[in-house]
Amino acid sequence: MRIFISTGEVSGDLQGAMLIEALKRQAALKAMDLEIVALGGDRMAETGVSLLGKTPKIASIGLIEALPFIMPTWKLQRKAKQYLQENPPDLLILIDYCGPNVAIGKYARKNIPQVPILYYIAPQAWVWTTNKKTTQDLVNITDHLLAIFSEEARYFAQKGMSVSWVGHPILDRMAQAPTREEARQKLGIKPDQTAIALLPVSRKQELKYLLPVVCQAAQQIQEKLPDVQFLIPLALEDYRSTISAMMEEYGLQGTILDGKSLDALAAADLAIAKSGTVNLELALLNVPQVVVYRLTPLTLWIAQNILKFSVPFLSPVNLVVMEEVVPELFQERATPEQIVQESLDLLLNPQRRQKTLSDYQRVREELGEVGVCDRAAQEILDYV
């Protein structure tokens, strides 16, 4: 079976790699030959698939922020479309990455209509959408959706899409996570030392808009807790020099960790994190967190006043139960002072900390059961 997979972002690369490994396992059980070509990143490349192009470095959120990546994205899109036209796969799998993947899906539906399109991890149109067109586009291009949230499955089923709920793949990843004690031993952190994970960057724009404010907050926390150790997992090697320079500028006691993100999360007493999949990882590890995010003022104004964009929450942890489990500091609220206030309260207030851990249990119950990637892989291989 020949499969083409398309995804973007650092998180999409991770989800894609986990799915590919599961596809290989399930194909071996069925004695099925498998050939996979993909758009993705380094993690997917490490699985041994043929990578047509790398997408994580050209990922962005926001309108103005996306401008520098329009041409690289367009070139990669053109390359993918040409490949699909010349080498139609048996199956096309799209993973999240709304704009580019919808464009690829539309092209495939029109030019190679015989190829089934499966969407794994749909864009969050079930939470937000600027208009009904986003949802309708997804319905039009998708033969079957493998949903990771139960509400996602209900939403798209109501719109007429063929859907199955497989659960969230983060459960499979976190099943391999070390305990707090194991992670601290591996990283050389004393059992009683305060450790804080800083997770502000997975996209280039966040080096400018998020990293400085998080480092300023970390500096203030360090002044109040002199023994604190900061742990910064590296999303992409390209970001190392900027992060290192920023840590030096603010005199932060910490370590940049390459390839040890789960160790950093598991070892932490608290995390200061951008909104994204990492919020769910922290919840599953019972690590309290402060979620922060910033866009350019112009992007925010356009989104609110022209596109009429609104969303109840930013973090998937809060979206899963539709209430604030973790504090979200967005835009003008994402100040060093606010971050410090929320962080110290979560660290030093036992009642607040226990409430967070209790709420995490409710989030966990909404994510399904371990074995997500294998269930998804079985459905994919049985589809054709």
Swiss-Prot record:
Q: Please give the Pfam families that the UniProt record associates with this protein.
A: LpxB (PF02684)
What does the record give as its pathway? Bacterial outer membrane biogenesis; LPS lipid A biosynthesis
User: Can you cite an annotated GO cellular component?
Assistant: membrane
Summarizing the function annotation, the protein's role is: Condensation of UDP-2,3-diacylglucosamine and 2,3-diacylglucosamine-1-phosphate to form lipid A disaccharide, a precursor of lipid A, a phosphorylated glycolipid that anchors the lipopolysaccharide to the outer membrane of the cell.
Its UniProt entry gives the catalysed reaction(s) as: a lipid X + a UDP-2-N,3-O-bis[(3R)-3-hydroxyacyl]-alpha-D-glucosamine = a lipid A disaccharide + UDP + H(+)
Origin superkingdom: Bacteria
Establish whether keyword Cell wall biogenesis/degradation is in the entry.
no
Q: Which UniProt keywords apply?
A: Glycosyltransferase, Lipid A biosynthesis, Lipid biosynthesis, Lipid metabolism, Transferase
User: Which family does this protein fall into?
Assistant: Belongs to the LpxB family.
Against SUPFAM superfamilies, the record matches this protein to:
UDP-Glycosyltransferase/glycogen phosphorylase
Q: What is its EC number?
A: 2.4.1.182
Keyword match RNA-binding: no
Biological process, per Gene Ontology: lipid A biosynthetic process
Q: What class of enzyme is it?
A: transferase
Q: Which InterPro entries match?
A: Glyco_trans_19 (IPR003835)
Question: What gene name is listed for this protein?
Answer: lpxB
What is the protein's given name? Lipid-A-disaccharide synthase
Which GO MF terms are attached to this record?
Answer: lipid-A-disaccharide synthase activity; phospholipid binding
